[in-house]
């Protein structure tokens, strides 16, 4: 379902944990990481589509999250021709999105990447709020910056670090001022490694997705081999 300009209506989801870190998923069988997102079906409202995509991609139910805010207007990005099926070129232009900021009120183990038979992600991790701007695929970077910037003022005030992020001190024409070397190191108590600890379904510890380095001090999360 495209609008007359060739954009598909879509929702994007920024999911926060209790430290105001964001869910970051690795697309299945690729090296590409992104926020959950998906199309709005005919007859759906953006909020209905958001809750459907939240379950399909992350395995969460409405009771697991609190809706904090949403973007006021559609945010658009164009998809380069090389990513568009040949039969859709000339018709499909990209996505127009309403973005939702959610906070997880459940637990990390409520996340399930295998909630459906057509999973979108095969790995996930928590990242600091602005980190995705440096690691998302280039053609989505502009819409990510618009969404993150518009929704940043709604971040729950429960984290000194995120109060600093909300101060608006940014460098080089809108890029994040926070050090991007501080990608989430899984230091939350719910993800520290302890004997007998159960990870979320399909998850284990792995290298930093930005570098592929197996630095044990910078673990990520991924689906185990086999």
Swiss-Prot record:
<dbReference type="GO" id="GO:0034432">
    <property type="term" value="F:bis(5'-adenosyl)-pentaphosphatase activity"/>
</dbReference>
<protein>
    <recommendedName>
        <fullName>RNA pyrophosphohydrolase</fullName>
        <ecNumber>3.6.1.-</ecNumber>
    </recommendedName>
</protein>
<feature type="domain" description="Nudix hydrolase">
    <location>
        <begin position="6"/>
        <end position="149"/>
    </location>
</feature>
<dbReference type="InterPro" id="IPR022927">
    <property type="entry name" value="RppH"/>
</dbReference>
<feature type="short sequence motif" description="Nudix box">
    <location>
        <begin position="38"/>
        <end position="59"/>
    </location>
</feature>
<dbReference type="GO" id="GO:0019693">
    <property type="term" value="P:ribose phosphate metabolic process"/>
</dbReference>
<comment type="function">
    <text>Accelerates the degradation of transcripts by removing pyrophosphate from the 5'-end of triphosphorylated RNA, leading to a more labile monophosphorylated state that can stimulate subsequent ribonuclease cleavage.</text>
</comment>
<dbReference type="Pfam" id="PF00293">
    <property type="entry name" value="NUDIX"/>
</dbReference>
<dbReference type="GO" id="GO:0008893">
    <property type="term" value="F:guanosine-3',5'-bis(diphosphate) 3'-diphosphatase activity"/>
</dbReference>
<dbReference type="GO" id="GO:0006753">
    <property type="term" value="P:nucleoside phosphate metabolic process"/>
</dbReference>
<dbReference type="InterPro" id="IPR020476">
    <property type="entry name" value="Nudix_hydrolase"/>
</dbReference>
<keyword id="KW-0378">Hydrolase</keyword>
<dbReference type="InterPro" id="IPR000086">
    <property type="entry name" value="NUDIX_hydrolase_dom"/>
</dbReference>
<dbReference type="InterPro" id="IPR015797">
    <property type="entry name" value="NUDIX_hydrolase-like_dom_sf"/>
</dbReference>
<dbReference type="InterPro" id="IPR020084">
    <property type="entry name" value="NUDIX_hydrolase_CS"/>
</dbReference>
<comment type="similarity">
    <text>Belongs to the Nudix hydrolase family. RppH subfamily.</text>
</comment>
<feature type="region of interest" description="Disordered">
    <location>
        <begin position="197"/>
        <end position="226"/>
    </location>
</feature>
């Amino acid at each position: 379902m495209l609008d007359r300009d060739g954009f598909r209506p879509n929702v994007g989801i920024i999911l926060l944990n209790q430290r105001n870190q964001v869910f970051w998923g690795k697309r299945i069988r690729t090296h590409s990481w992104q926020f959950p997102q998906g199309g709005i079906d005919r007859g759906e409202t953006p909020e209905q589509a958001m809750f459907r995509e939240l379950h399909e991609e992350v395995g969460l139910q409405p009771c697991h999250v609190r809706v904090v805010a949403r973007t006021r207007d559609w945010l658009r990005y164009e998809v380069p021709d090389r990513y568009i099926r040949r039969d859709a070129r000339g018709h499909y232009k990209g996505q127009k999105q309403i973005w939702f900021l959610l906070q997880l009120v459940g637990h990390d183990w409520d996340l399930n990447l295998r909630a459906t038979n057509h999973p979108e992600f095969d790995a996930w991790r928590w990242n600091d709020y602005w980190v995705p701007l440096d690691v998302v695929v280039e053609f989505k970077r502009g819409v990510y910056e618009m969404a993150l910037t518009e929704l940043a003022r709604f971040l729950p005030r429960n984290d000194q670090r995120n109060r600093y992020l909300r101060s608006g001190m940014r460098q080089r024409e809108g890029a994040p001022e926070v050090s991007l070397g501080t990608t989430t190191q899984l230091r939350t108590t719910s993800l520290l490694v302890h004997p007998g600890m159960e990870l979320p379904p399909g998850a284990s510890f792995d290298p930093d997705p930005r570098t592929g380095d197996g630095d044990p001090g910078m673990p990520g999360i991924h689906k185990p081999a086999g």
